Amino acid sequence: MQIANTLPELIGNTPLLRLERFAPGAGVLAKLESFNPLSSAKDRAGLYMILDAEERGLLQPGAVIVEPTSGNTGVALAYIGRQRGYRVVLTMPETMSQERRSLLAALGAELVLTEGARGMGGAIERAKELLESTPGAWMPDQFNNPANARAHYETTGPELWRDTDGGVDVLVAGVGSGGTITGVGEYLKSKNPNVKIVAVEPAGSPVLSGGKPGPHKVQGIGAGFVPQVLNTSVYDEIIPVENEDAFQTGRRIGSTEGVLVGISSGAAAWAALQLAKRPENEGKTIVALLPVTGDEAYAAARELARTEGVLAGVSSGAAAHAARILAQRPDMRGKTIAVVLPDTGERYLSTGLFA
């Protein structure tokens, strides 16, 4: 029998999808990290960092996990940490989406919001203050924790190599904490030094390219500084992506492939598409690591409540979002689209979904 006893046992072994409708004939594959239990690549890092801390005696029973996070690491730490009996306190910029905050609260995390203009730097400073003032606290410190990158060296990288039969030519990945591109990149280059690793960052905060940090809307990447865990020698090229290109590409993947992805996934896919257009990459296999699912279902549910006065659940939000994508197609102009909203939203009132 294949029965998991705990949710973290289901982390990893996510599928590869050929994006043939999104990029016909381009040889672009998507590593769908949204198939992890809580829908992101951070599930891997969260599990590895907690297990590593337990093994080294840094996490004692009843301890408090404190971490600055832009969202998905917090989701992973919340559900894994709470399941293992820890209190989880997360600091994050106030610019993070209400949907993400609601999800974290629903998982039992305590949120501390910091000034948005200070970016992740402000969240990190606040987390350090809490670490010093909270007895029994431990900080995973994803930006500096080697277990973050090791999670991807030992799992994501081998999966990509196995599933492509060693045929991956180019890896495209966004850079947030740097753990994913470092771990996967180091593993792939250990198998084939000729594999090209491409880093993706927000054009509004091109720190890796030598620019200045700044505000941007590509949640999950672009921390505004160079993380210590990031191996800056592992990537061969950096591609900055504009906010709108990330948004539009994410929507295109949804409408062409039926896969709802987040903004950072849209950024990685956009960069992969630009690489596929280059003559030197003709016939090559390009893998875009899509780290997260979209928050569109949550956002659509909130929008239904605000604009139509309809208290709809998340599954209804997903249906409404899909209908909106259909309505934007030229072939649907003038047509009547009926949407079935299968659930009400009263069960989500306690999570802050409609706050």
Model-derived regions: residue spans:
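PLP-dependent amino-acid enzyme catalytic core
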Residues: M1-A355
